[in-house]
């Protein structure tokens, strides 16, 4: 039976450490402020934005919320970002994705000042990550690295398979695992013999966007399984990309959904916000 990797517990530990750091920074007159832009009222996005605000409150960072109508133009969003870039009291800016179809996400991300890009999505942040320079790391992959390290799971020299190649999780995840000296394979919709590739993984990280897609037949005995997916099943219960019930008896460690990767994403956003305060 696998050990559960408790993302809630680990994320709270991180937020408590950050809270202490923020208190010390405030004594030096350094304040933190995160501006969150949400376009439209997608229910999932609203939940994420609410959780981000709560986390800001917890660690002692001020949050500004810009809730814009679905029909807001790209130009209006870019003007708002320009204003926030110029506001020295704002250290972090994030635009909650996905954006409505008529808005070019890349253009919006590119408009955010790299020094305030606490999501770690800007070309400058990504470039710094590729060559191992300091910069803001994307929150979900950075959170997964913390989950592994704080659970005393050795990454060095291990075979890691990342299923999914999105710009937000899959690609940066593979780079961060490479930084930790894992031997990394990235799988995607064109990968042949996916099952065989996954079965070679000491650490299997799944971000494929398909509910319960990875079952026990994809997992070798004793593997560490990290589930990035989040979906609602027919009974309206949350589930991941991994079929937890079948994999839990085969893995050595596994993240649950909910309560695994999700809380870590927000903890690492707070970590980036604190980093932005110090710059």
From Swiss-Prot:
GO terms for molecular function: methenyltetrahydrofolate cyclohydrolase activity; methylenetetrahydrofolate dehydrogenase (NADP+) activity. NADP(+) binds at residues 164-166, 189, 230. Keywords: Amino-acid biosynthesis, Histidine biosynthesis, Hydrolase, Methionine biosynthesis, Multifunctional enzyme, NADP, One-carbon metabolism, Oxidoreductase, Purine biosynthesis. Homodimer. This is Bifunctional protein FolD. Belongs to the tetrahydrofolate dehydrogenase/cyclohydrolase family. One of its GO terms (cellular component) is cytosol. One of its GO terms (biological process) is tetrahydrofolate interconversion. The keyword Cell inner membrane does not apply. Gene3D superfamilies: Leucine Dehydrogenase, chain A, domain 1 (3.40.50.10860), NAD(P)-binding Rossmann-like Domain (3.40.50.720). Catalyzes the oxidation of 5,10-methylenetetrahydrofolate to 5,10-methenyltetrahydrofolate and then the hydrolysis of 5,10-methenyltetrahydrofolate to 10-formyltetrahydrofolate. Its EC number is 1.5.1.5, 3.5.4.9. NCBIfam families: PRK10792.1 (NF008058), PRK14186.1 (NF010783). CDD domains: NAD_bind_m-THF_DH_Cyclohyd. It holds the Pfam family THF_DHG_CYH. It comes from the Bacteria. It catalyses: (6R)-5,10-methylene-5,6,7,8-tetrahydrofolate + NADP(+) = (6R)-5,10-methenyltetrahydrofolate + NADPH; (6R)-5,10-methenyltetrahydrofolate + H2O = (6R)-10-formyltetrahydrofolate + H(+). Disulfide bonds: none annotated. Pathway: One-carbon metabolism; tetrahydrofolate interconversion.
């Amino acid at each position: 039976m696998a050990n559960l990797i408790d993302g809630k517990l680990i994320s709270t530990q991180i937020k408590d450490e950050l809270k202490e750091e923020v208190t010390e920074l405030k004594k030096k007159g350094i304040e933190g402020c995160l501006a969150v832009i949400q376009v439209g009222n997608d229910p999932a996005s609203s939940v994420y934005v609410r959780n981000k605000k709560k986390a800001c409150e917890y660690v002692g960072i001020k949050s500004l919320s810009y809730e814009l109508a679905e029909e807001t133009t790209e130009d209006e969003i870019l003007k708002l970002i320009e204003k926030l870039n110029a506001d020295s009291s704002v250290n972090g800016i994030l635009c909650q994705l996905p954006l409505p179809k008529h808005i070019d996400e890349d253009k919006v991300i590119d408009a955010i000042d790299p020094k305030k890009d606490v999501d770690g999505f800007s070309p400058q942040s990504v470039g710094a990550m590729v060559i191992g320079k300091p910069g803001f790391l994307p929150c979900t992959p950075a959170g997964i690295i913390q989950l592994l390290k704080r659970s005393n799971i050795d990454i060095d020299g291990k075979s890691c398979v990342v299923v999914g190649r999105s710009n937000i999780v899959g690609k940066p995840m593979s780079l961060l695992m490479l930084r930790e000296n894992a031997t990394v394979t990235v799988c995607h919709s064109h990968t042949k013999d996916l099952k065989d590739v996954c079965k070679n993984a000491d650490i299997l990280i799944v971000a494929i966007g398909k509910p319960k897609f990875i079952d026990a037949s994809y997992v070798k005995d004793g593997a560490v399984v990290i589930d990035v997916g989040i979906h609602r099943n027919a009974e309206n219960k949350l589930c991941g990309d991994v079929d937890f019930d079948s994999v839990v008896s085969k893995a050595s460690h596994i993240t649950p959904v909910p309560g695994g990767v999700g809380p870590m994403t927000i903890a690492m956003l707070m970590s980036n916000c604190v980093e932005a305060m110090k710059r």
